[in-house]
Amino acid sequence: MELLLFVMSLILLTFSKAIPLFNHNSFYFEKLDDCIAAVINCTKSEVPLLLEPIYQPPAYNEDVMSILLQPPTKKKPFSRIMVTDEFLSDFLLLQDNPEQLRTLFALIRDPESRDNWLNFFNGFQTCSPSVGITTCIRDNCRKYSPEKITYVNNFFVDNIAGLEFNISENTDSFYSNIGFLLYLENPAKGVTKIIRFPFNSLTLFDTILNCLKYFHLKTGVELDLLKHMETYNSKLPFRSSRPTILIRNT
């Protein structure tokens, strides 16, 4: 739980019209040191470490990606490729990018521009595995076999910059539009981009609610986002009663 709490406390959580949870000028931000200290203490146990060193940027494994970036396996009908300014600027994200393959897969999965990029790489996974995908950073090229790339359920192996909530007022059926904000950067070109991946899941809603409530119980900090989520949760028809502490114990 401490590990999940740490992850949730470092990312930017927003609710509907961008209500910030943590920022440098907020009371919440001052509590991060306590949270980090708890995580450091937790990781002294024999439990395998699930996070990169706290004060260091993540070291990516080129052969491991989250399922958010897994390209579609089905070939789509070919249509025209729209060469827009945005499409051209995306090429700057790829040129000499140390994370070229990861960035390419993110663009292919981008809900806002996926049709264009799927047309550009139409059905590439249906080719012979011997063909593979070759990325080149300056004169350094590497060939990848798509079937050998490992996709994991842990979204945080990618550069997740935050989460975004748009929770519906309609509680007749569960709908919680949770978006993962993926940060892309090409340091060689000074280009950045944020891609939003919608991910609707009651389990994820419960997990985040548990983490925020645990943080509240441990620190006494009042969180606006927690109040909104608890209000919404209490109105769901399939919640028989409001939990006194956590929705789930695990």
From Swiss-Prot:
Top-level taxon in the UniProt lineage = Viruses
Q: What are the alphabetically sorted keywords of the record? A: Disulfide bond, Fusion of virus membrane with host cell membrane, Fusion of virus membrane with host membrane, Glycoprotein, Host cell membrane, Host Golgi apparatus, Host membrane, Membrane, Signal, Viral envelope protein, Viral penetration into host cytoplasm, Virion, Virus entry into host cell
Cystine pairings recorded for this chain: C136-C141
- Compartments, as annotated in UniProt: Virion membrane; Host cell membrane; Host Golgi apparatus, Host trans-Golgi network
Q: How does it sit in the membrane?
A: Peripheral membrane protein
* Ranges for domain gL betaherpesvirus-type: 31-239
Which residues does UniProt assign to the signal peptide?
A: 1-18
**Keyword Membrane among record annotations:** yes
Any Gene Ontology CC annotation: host cell Golgi apparatus
Any GO BP annotation: fusion of virus membrane with host plasma membrane
Q: How does it assemble?
A: Interacts with glycoprotein H (gH); this interaction is necessary for the correct processing and cell surface expression of gH. Part of a gH-gL-gO complex.
Per the similarity annotation, which family is this? Answer: Belongs to the herpesviridae glycoprotein L (gL) family. Betaherpesvirinae gL subfamily.
Record protein name field: Envelope glycoprotein L
Species per Swiss-Prot/TrEMBL record: Human herpesvirus 6A (strain Uganda-1102) (HHV-6 variant A)
The major lineage groups are: Viruses, Duplodnaviria, Heunggongvirae, Peploviricota, Herviviricetes
